[in-house]
Amino acid sequence: QRISFMRDKTRDDRFFILTLFAIAMELRKMGQLQPMLSVELAVGLPPEHYGTLRDKFANYFKRGSIQFVFNDTPICLMVQQVFVYPQAYAAVVPQAEKLRETPRTFVVDIGGYTTDVLLLRTTRPDMQFCRSLELGVIDMNNAIIGKVSALHDIQIEDDHIADIIMGRPSILPQEVQDTIFSETRSYSSQILDKLRELKVDLRATPAIFIGGGAALFRNFIESSPMVAHADFIPDQRANAIGYGMLANAQLSRMQTYNGGGDGIVRG
């Protein structure tokens, strides 16, 4: 069952439990899953919430020794350090050299429940200019599913919508496909209009679109007169890859200066 949107993910243990299993799955994929584990954890928060929630989010994962079972295997996990970074910024870290050539860039992260925006000044995030909209792919899909049901009496799911938008083969009637395209175009325009109301004018500043919504909305964004120049990072792992790069760099600096501190590291 999909977890509903939560601004503060520390309110209960659901995200902590999901993180435990994500760690176990990643280590298994790397061939490093063992009964006793000690890890450094790199996580992220939406830019708008980073300043107020980062310490609380870091402490959320600092619980000493945690025992759980993964695929019938007992595991004892110790999270040694927690690194917290702004989402969106992390996703473009691999492009730092290219970004040095541009004085201002908006990073637009279209996720499941929200669209988050961060302003970069060359390669540095301007944490005073963060915007967030409660508009995302899940919200759009729910609206499309309801409209298709009402207009055409056909029950569709998220995968049907993605197939149509991405141009993959589908047996859906043409009128249903037309409805999906029309609603997606309308929703992408709504996102761009709302961003402009928040002084995110993509006619004056280039943008990098990331997140699952970047690939879905790409054709609509590229053809919009509201966007002068857009690059896309469709890899849904982009933020996670950036967290890893930032954390490795920070660990290296800590080792150089013999740092350690309280085990909570802020980006």
Residue ranges and their predicted role:
Residues 115-119:
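Short beta-strand scaffold segments in enzyme catalytic cores
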Residues 142, 146-149:
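Long, charge-rich alpha-helical interaction segments
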Residues 121-123:
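Short acidic-glycine loop/turn motifs at beta-strand connectors
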Residues 152-154:
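Short, basic interhelical loop/turn and adjoining N-cap
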Residues 108-112:
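Active-site-proximal alpha-helical scaffolds that flank and shape metal-associated catalytic sites
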Residues 1-105, 125-138, 159-267:
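Nucleotide/phosphate-binding catalytic cleft detector across ATP-hydrolyzing
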